[in-house]
Design a protein with these regions (language model features):
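Surface-exposed amphipathic alpha-helical tracts and adjacent flexible/coil segments at the periphery
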Residues: 1-22, 27-30, 34, 59-69, ...
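Active-site beta->alpha loop and helix N-cap motifs at the rims of alpha/beta catalytic domains
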Residues: 13-16, 34-125
């Protein structure tokens, strides 16, 4: 059954949550200070979480909290209190992987929907039905499942059971969370949110009779990336996503920047709305996914086994954020906060919530005291700039750069 999926965006901290909400997310997913699979995202303290939920709900956006680590014996005793706190904060759904945590969530956070994490690698309809029978509202499917398999699953599971899939972002070389490379090589547990991503390392060969003598392996001028997955991007295939009966598309990236959360969410929002309304997708919004740092894109496993890509595995970083708009009046008099330096006379681009990207030449700016400023330099510096039109707060000023070669 064709349906328009909700867009679930990453919110690694309060700024990222605000960006995702304002740029068009239907729901955001985040973590508290425990059990959340992303130790290096900002995450939310007990004091911050109710504020985050309140902000999201004021904008009609749902909040999903990850509780998807595999807790050990000494951690389980802390789960009931933690789950009660999440329920009390008004969280809409919990993303769970451990069966014990799933059961406790039903008892201590009964008002929260229970969603099954991709950590469970659900890849067939019998597994999905089993979780539904236990009380799950939604299952997050393994990234390795094809669209054809999803269509079959949709036809063989209860209509009330929702299907969520990843549509954009980094992919794991292993089944999600089931890789032991990080544990073995660095002592950091991927099932506890601490993956060191050794699949992204550069490797060399060593012959056993020549210890200490390393032989480089070359894929390109940077070395080799034997296990380095490309990024997923399904923005050109949202029609197929809708036809498969998927209820929610998820953007990976809680540990990525607020700019990433905003731009990717906004791109999918506009393209999905166009497709759902029967319009041709606006290429300007589709192109926004090229304006964030990313590896070369692929469609993952959605269209079957994709084979291997050997031509390039480097990061693409062709755009840099210069500033964030904090206020702007009807005449285009804007107040901004500096992120990276730029100068009067530079060609810059602005994009914001429901603000179509446009290009302009940076004018002479003014500092907080009103003095002319040719080149703001201090990070987080507040300055003024005249724009040709009003733009919403949380809009970005960016410019084209060439950082890819430095990766």
């Amino acid at each position: 059954m064709r349906r328009k999926p909700e867009i679930l965006a990453p919110a690694g901290d309060m700024e990222k949550l605000q960006m995702a909400v304002l740029y068009g997310a239907d729901a955001v997913y985040l973590a508290g200070t425990s059990f959340g699979m992303r130790s290096f995202a900002g995450n939310f303290t007990p004091e911050e979480l109710p504020k985050a939920v309140r902000f999201a709900h004021e904008h009609g956006v749902r909040v999903h909290v990850t509780v998807n680590t595999m807790p050990r014996n000494d951690e389980v005793a802390h789960l009931p209190e933690y789950l009660e706190r999440l329920g009390g904060a008004g969280v809409d759904a919990l993303i769970l992987a451990d069966l014990g945590a799933f059961t406790l969530a039903g008892k201590y956070a009964p008002k929260c929907e229970r969603h099954i994490s991709t950590q469970q690698s659900i890849a067939n309809y019998e597994c999905a039905r089993a979780w539904y029978d236990l009380g799950a509202k939604r299952v997050v499917l393994a990234r390795e499942v094809s669209l054809q398999e999803i269509r079959e699953m949709r036809a063989k599971i209860p209509e009330e059971l929702e299907l969520e899939t990843f549509c954009h972002g980094a992919m794991c070389v292993s089944y999600s969370g089931r890789c032991l490379l990080s544990n073995y090589m660095t002592g950091r547990d991927s099932n506890r949110g601490q993956c060191a991503q050794p699949c992204r390392y550069q490797y060399a060969l060593m012959e056993e009779k020549r210890p200490g003598e390393y032989f480089p392996v070359f894929e390109d001028e940077k070395g080799t990336y034997i296990m380095n997955s490309r990024d997923m991007c399904m923005i050109d295939h949202l029609d197929d996503i809708m036809d498969a009966g998927i209820d929610c598309i998820k953007i990976e990236g809680r540990a990525k920047s607020a700019y990433y959360a905003a731009i990717v969410t906004g791109a999918y929002r506009h393209v999905l709305d166009d497709i759902a309304a029967g319009r041709e997708a606006d290429p300007v919004w589709r192109d926004e996914v090229e304006h964030v740092s990313h590896r070369h894109y692929s469609t993952g496993f959605y269209y079957g086994q994709p084979g291997q890509y050997y031509d390039n595995s480097r990061y693409i970083r062709d755009w840099q954020v210069c500033a964030v708009v904090t206020a702007c009046d009807e005449d285009g008099n804007a107040t901004l906060s500096l992120r990276n330096k730029f100068a009067a006379g530079d060609e810059i681009e602005l994009v914001g919530p429901d603000c179509r990207p446009f290009t302009m030449t940076a004018p002479v700016m003014r500092d907080a005291e009103g003095f002319e400023l040719l080149e703001p330099r201090t990070p987080q510096m507040i300055f003024k700039m005249k724009l040709p039109q009003r733009v919403p707060p949380m809009s970005f000023v960016r410019h084209a750069v060439s950082l890819s070669a430095k990766d």
